[in-house]
Amino acid sequence: MPRKGHIVKRDVLPDPIYNSKLITRIVNTIMEDGKKGTAQGILYGALNRIKDQTGREAIDVFNEALNNISPILEVRARRIGGQNYQVPVEVRPERRQALALRWLVQYAKKRNEKTMEERLAKEILDASQGTGAAVKKREEVHKMAEANKAFAHYRW
């Protein structure tokens, strides 16, 4: 905890093409070793592929995918009386979005298509249809929270 008060969260600038802060955030999630140009190339390429394949606006498909990936509940470890309990808690909106973006990129990297652009496009399409590894991860997290519902009264 900082001694000098609350730390103000810096806001990201919207990206130049889609004018969306969400797109900037996923570019930052994809980026490795400070190579933002490469990350933007991957994302814009993936969004173009999505638009070609579906005939819909890529940003709409992307938002739909994020809604399907975003977790509502998660479990947090809480130590009470020398024992650790997995306590289900609601996920704050900002963390919800961050987790969704992180899972999307993480599971896109694990796919076996040839290029990252292709993998990301396929994972976004799968997520928008309610399938794919990222959606499975969300279901897993929800199942864990549901299983530990008995400890919900330990919430803080």
From Swiss-Prot:
Check the record and name the InterPro entries matching this protein.
Ribosomal_uS7 (IPR000235), Ribosomal_uS7_bac/org-type (IPR005717), Ribosomal_uS7_CS (IPR020606), Ribosomal_uS7_dom (IPR023798), Ribosomal_uS7_dom_sf (IPR036823)
Gene3D superfamilies in the record: Ribosomal protein S7 domain
Q: Which gene encodes it?
A: rpsG
Q: Which family does it belong to?
A: Belongs to the universal ribosomal protein uS7 family.
Check the record and name the Pfam families matching this protein.
Ribosomal_S7
GO BP terms: translation
This protein's name = Small ribosomal subunit protein uS7
HAMAP family assigned: Ribosomal_uS7_B
Q: How does it assemble?
A: Part of the 30S ribosomal subunit. Contacts proteins S9 and S11.
